[in-house]
A protein has these predicted regions:
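Generic structural motif recognizing short loop/turn segments at the entrances and edges of beta-strands
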Residues: 80-85, 127, 132, 252-261
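C-terminal accessory module of base-excision DNA glycosylases/AP lyases that mediates lesion recognition
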Residues: 1-69, 144-171, 189, 193-287
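A general structural signal for short secondary-structure junctions and capping/turn motifs
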Residues: 75-79, 179-180, 206-207
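Alpha-helical ds-nucleic-acid-binding substructure associated with the helix-hairpin-helix region
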Residues: 97-179
Length: 287
């Protein structure tokens, strides 16, 4: 099991109403996205934390990498094994600049794809979630070999595992990681939940999702405040509460959004708590 380095990030910090704070965070972050995309000059918020720290957009489909993945994989919607290969490749890469240089046809030749990636100054994203080596049939594959060779070879196996998981993304993540043996299964989950953008008959967008280590501290706060039995129950309740706290949002939240933004809220309140610093990849740099 992965050691949660974020577990104590909110220790000692009082958040009087974590539900209200969650939605206030989301509203402000979405307003920042709208102002930035409309061409307004920086800063887009009076909040000093938003002026100095990097945060993901509220809705996953608005993130740059997500937009690139959607464009890359969309032609494969009706070919489920290739779609799954494309999404797993994309989440192992997780770098917009790389994905934008490729076409889904590149997936058909693993050797040429690997050569293309090697020629790039940097093909993968080091600044997001960690991507570890993968085991398959007692053989270890590096990140680049997994993304290119392994996913090409096992796309049918992955498809069978996903379909046998009966629309359950949590179970599908566990079933695949029984084979991969990764300490952190988050990249698997990300690739699987991406299927919902294209094939809700395989993974519904309304699926309950596992808790990532980054989201756990804030979901724990929400769970305690709401008096619920699980993080999945928290997601269901927060989706219901959106009508009260943020009725004008551009769409209804799904469970993945609650998990996703709980991670961002943990980051935000970690700055307040002094357990996170505005340095390195955390610092917002506006060009």
């Amino acid at each position: 099991m992965t050691k949660n380095k974020y577990r104590t990030s909110l220790d000692g910090l009082v958040i009087e109403n974590p539900v209200e704070s969650f939605f206030n965070y989301c509203i402000e972050r979405e307003n920042i996205r709208i102002k930035r995309e409309s061409g307004e000059a920086f800063p887009w918020s009076e909040d000093k934390i938003f002026q100095k720290g990097r945060f993901l957009n509220v809705f996953r489909e608005d993130d740059r990498v997500s937009k690139s993945i959607i464009n890359f994989a969309k032609p494969l919607t009706d070919d489920l094994p290739l779609l799954i290969q494309a999404l797993f490749f994309s989440r192992w890469c997780n770098r917009q600049e790389t994905i934008d240089k490729l076409n889904h046809v590149d997936l058909l030749d693993a050797d040429k794809l690997k050569d293309k990636l090697i020629q790039l100054e940097q093909w993968e994203n080091f600044n997001a979630y960690p991507v570890q080596d993968v085991m398959w049939n007692e053989k270890t594959y590096s990140r680049i070999d997994t993304a290119t060779t392994l996913f090409y070879e096992i796309k049918d196996d992955l498809t069978e595992i996903v379909l046998d998981s009966n629309l359950d993304v949590i179970q599908a993540t566990k079933n695949i990681n029984k084979r991969f043996k990764m300490e952190n299964d988050f990249p698997i989950f990300m690739a699987l939940i991406d299927i919902a953008w294209f094939r809700e008959d395989v993974i519904p967008i309304t699926s309950q999702v596992p808790t990532g280590i980054g989201a756990q501290p804030y979901l724990d706060r929400l769970q305690e405040y709401l008096g619920l039995e699980s993080h999945q129950a928290v997601a269901t309740e927060m989706i219901s509460l959106q009508k009260e706290y943020w009725p004008e949002a551009k769409r209804t939240f799904y469970p993945i959004d609650i998990e996703y933004q709980s991670c961002e809220c943990r980051k935000y309140f970690s700055y307040i708590n002094g357990t996170k610093k505005f340095e390195g990849k955390n610092r917002l740099i506006v060009n």
